[in-house]
């Protein structure tokens, strides 16, 4: 189903904070040309918490329209309000998204039973695949493997974006949910190790800037060429470090601006990058030949 390098798209903006639709369209075309295996708009990296509902939906619509089924689109549809998540998921389905990514509800700290009910309600409301997004550092709730196994029995819940950074999780998830449950890493630094533990791909922040290398690493692993996969991951390490030197997506948006895709602007409360972080990013990109 979903595999390889899927990019967690930034949302390009003008300097005044308006969404730069033309830059987004060019960015998507470039991503596909560079070999990205899938597009994931309006997630954490897409600044979904600071987008209005209309903006959120428009970004999904543009992504689907430009992609034209050349690669799958997994639209962000997360919320800490179940009714809102259902609405976003139904919109994504209505405009042609291939799946939805639904984050564990943040701030209100539901119990495991609450998580079970939330995801079941969203999955019941749509007819396209749903990927659970488990990211305890941001949501302050960790879905247990037992809860995930129960949700995996739902025909529309097909996998997880695992951003726990715990490399024992995919092993336990495979044991509980079966090998067909689609496990995608949400951590660029451990993406290769995640594959070795049972994953099938990565929803990547770094792929915003180095889509070809990220896709080639995933392809090398699938081809059984571990030496090449390890070499690419080693080359990417300085860029991974720069990408997460400050809160995502500020570094990624600065890097994208250097490539000509929108400005570096992030909506508050995300602040502009420190000059030292900008220098780190430029050095990492130059080292990979992404900047002259």
Swiss-Prot record:
GO terms for biological process: diaminopimelate biosynthetic process; lysine biosynthetic process via diaminopimelate. The active site is at residues 133, 161. Its EC number is 4.3.3.7. HAMAP family: DapA. Pyruvate binds at residues 45, 203. It comes from the Bacteria. CDD domains: DHDPS. The record marks 44, 107 as: Part of a proton relay during catalysis. The gene is dapA. The keyword Lyase applies. Catalyzes the condensation of (S)-aspartate-beta-semialdehyde [(S)-ASA] and pyruvate to 4-hydroxy-tetrahydrodipicolinate (HTPA). GO terms for cellular component: cytosol. Belongs to the DapA family. Pfam families: DHDPS. It is an enzyme of class 4 (lyase). The lineage of its organism: Bacteria, Pseudomonadati, Pseudomonadota, Alphaproteobacteria, Acetobacterales. This is 4-hydroxy-tetrahydrodipicolinate synthase. It is found in: Cytoplasm. It catalyses: L-aspartate 4-semialdehyde + pyruvate = (2S,4S)-4-hydroxy-2,3,4,5-tetrahydrodipicolinate + H2O + H(+).
């Amino acid at each position: 189903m979903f595999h390889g390098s899927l990019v967690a798209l930034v949302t390009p903006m003008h300097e005044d904070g308006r969404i730069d639709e033309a830059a987004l369209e060019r960015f998507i075309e470039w991503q596909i040309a560079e070999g990205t295996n899938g597009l994931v708009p309006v997630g954490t990296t897409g600044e979904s918490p600071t987008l209005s509902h209309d903006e959120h939906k428009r970004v999904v619509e543009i992504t689907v329209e430009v992609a034209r089924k050349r690669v799958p689109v997994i639209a962000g549809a997360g919320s800490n309000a179940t009714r809102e998540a259902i609405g976003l998921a139904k919109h994504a389905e209505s405009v042609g998204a291939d799946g939805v990514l639904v984050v564990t509800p943040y701030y209100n700290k539901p119990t495991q039973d609450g998580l079970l009910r939330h995801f079941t309600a969203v999955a019941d409301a749509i007819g396209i695949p749903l990927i659970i997004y488990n990211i305890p550092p941001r949501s302050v709730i960790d879905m247990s493997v037992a809860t995930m196994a129960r949700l995996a029995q739902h025909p529309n819940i097909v996998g997880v974006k695992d951003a726990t950074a715990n490399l024992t999780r995919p092993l336990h998830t495979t044991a509980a949910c079966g090998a067909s449950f689609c496990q995608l890493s949400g951590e660029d630094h451990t993406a290769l190790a995640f594959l070795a533990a049972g994953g099938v791909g990565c929803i990547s922040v770094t792929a915003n800037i180095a889509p070809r290398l990220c896709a080639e690493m995933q392809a090398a692993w699938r081809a059984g060429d571990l030496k090449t996969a390890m070499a690419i991951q080693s080359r990417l390490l300085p860029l991974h470090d720069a990408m997460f030197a400050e809160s995502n997506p500020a570094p990624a948006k600065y890097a994208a601006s250097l490539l000509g895709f929108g400005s570096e602007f992030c909506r508050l409360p995300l602040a502009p990058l420190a000059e030292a972080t900008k220098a780190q990013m430029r050095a990492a990109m130059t080292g990979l030949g992404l900047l002259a």
